[in-house]
């Protein structure tokens, strides 16, 4: 159950600006339109303050086990596969032979799960600033193959990792950091980050970036901001979008290409996907008129 309430309505039991109320029956998430989205809580799994952010894992009546970071919903067990399949597979299929993959933002490890479905993959480096998020998600939200022999995890600020990286170039990079422009991932949403990322890619490479909400007024600034930055660095930047049920929003992504000139799929779709297929791949790149107008495409 999700309720949308104006600020100040029913807040007497809320201990802070967001999160669980004192009864532990509802979780309050600030809505960018000025109100709140309120979720009915079935059980509280863990509340934890890391060095970087507040981590809440709760079981919601509607969405099941869900991850909140600093009061913002990140993922639910009911539909995480929609988000992660949309994030990973368009970029992976475009590259002719993705062997080395960089994942910026490991989180629950679901992107690692999707990447390893491609037999060409030899190495995955996953970078996340918050080791505790990764550990708690593995414990409470289901194991993912982050301990596969092809996977190496680095717990560091993503921008610092990119800046200091001197290893073999990457074929695919997946940028899946939190969508606020002022939180732990603020160093990623910068022109210098993507310029340096471009330098550590191979001659032929694909990059996918989660582009935040398409229509919500505040986060839309991030959507346009990211697109403008990517256009300054990559010769081809293609936006796409789809509806994420638990977000109650149209969510955007960008594929950026280096040394590849089109989105022609070069790999078959992995067999065990739940959402993404050929029809979906065609549909998501057909943006609604308001989005095309905002991006000038």
Curated annotation (Swiss-Prot):
Catalytic center residues: 176 (proton acceptor)
Single Gene Ontology BP annotation: spermidine biosynthetic process
Sequence positions that bind spermidine: 84, 108
Organism, scientific name: Caldanaerobacter subterraneus subsp. tengcongensis (strain DSM 15242 / JCM 11007 / NBRC 100824 / MB4) (Thermoanaerobacter tengcongensis)
Assembly and oligomerization: Homodimer or homotetramer.
UniProt gene name: speE2
UniProt keyword terms in alphabetical order: Cytoplasm, Polyamine biosynthesis, Spermidine biosynthesis, Transferase
Top-rank taxon: Bacteria
Nuclease among keywords: no
Family the UniProt entry places it in: Belongs to the spermidine/spermine synthase family.
Entry's localization field: Cytoplasm
Assigned EC number: 2.5.1.16
Stretches assigned to the PABS domain: 26-258
GO MF terms, alphabetically ordered: spermidine synthase activity; thermospermine synthase activity
Top enzyme category: transferase
Summary of the function given for this chain in its UniProt record: Catalyzes the irreversible transfer of a propylamine group from the amino donor S-adenosylmethioninamine (decarboxy-AdoMet) to putrescine (1,4-diaminobutane) to yield spermidine.
PROSITE patterns reported for this sequence: PABS_2
Pfam families for this protein: Spermine_synt_N (PF17284), Spermine_synth (PF01564)
HAMAP family given in the database record: Spermidine_synth (MF_00198)
Protein name per Swiss-Prot or TrEMBL: Polyamine aminopropyltransferase 2
Main location: cytoplasm
Keyword Cytoplasm assigned: yes
Lineage: Bacteria, Bacillati, Bacillota, Clostridia, Thermoanaerobacterales
Pathway assigned in UniProt: Amine and polyamine biosynthesis; spermidine biosynthesis; spermidine from putrescine: step 1/1
Reactions performed catalytically: S-adenosyl 3-(methylsulfanyl)propylamine + putrescine = S-methyl-5'-thioadenosine + spermidine + H(+)
Positions of S-methyl-5'-thioadenosine binding: 53, 128, 157-158, 184
